[in-house]
Design a protein with these regions (language model features):
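Phosphate- and other anionic-substrate recognition elements at nucleic-acid/protein interfaces
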Residues: 1-105
């Protein structure tokens, strides 16, 4: 079984594992947005990254860290984080990959 583990923050990452062995590790694909060049998830790059690391028909699961609002984070910051989390869910749905959520320890 192949597992794609995702830490959904913009500074997060993606790990591809198979049979308890790490095959690849990637930084979260991001791109600049707006006049201030703030970072946002590059969903198209995420799709490409996932497709390059799987074969359709393989037994694959995506595991995403499920995080909640954190004290001290602003509304805008949490909204942007939610957008990234939702985009990751959308990419997995579009690729028809089963997605599971785990709480951070």
């Amino acid at each position: 079984m192949k597992i794609i583990g995702i830490d959904p923050g913009l500074s997060g990452g993606i790990a591809v594992l198979e049979n308890n062995k790490v095959l690849n590790i990637f930084d979260m694909p991001v791109m600049p947005e707006g006049k201030k060049n703030k970072r946002q998830l590059n969903s198209a790059q995420l799709v490409t990254l996932i497709k390059e690391n799987i074969k359709f028909g393989e037994d694959i699961s995506v595991v995403v860290e499920q995080v909640n609002a954190m004290p001290g984070q602003g509304v805008t910051s949490m909204f942007n984080f939610g957008q990234t989390f939702g985009a990751i869910k959308g990419v997995c749905a579009a690729l028809e990959l089963p997605i599971f959520f785990v709480r951070p320890s």
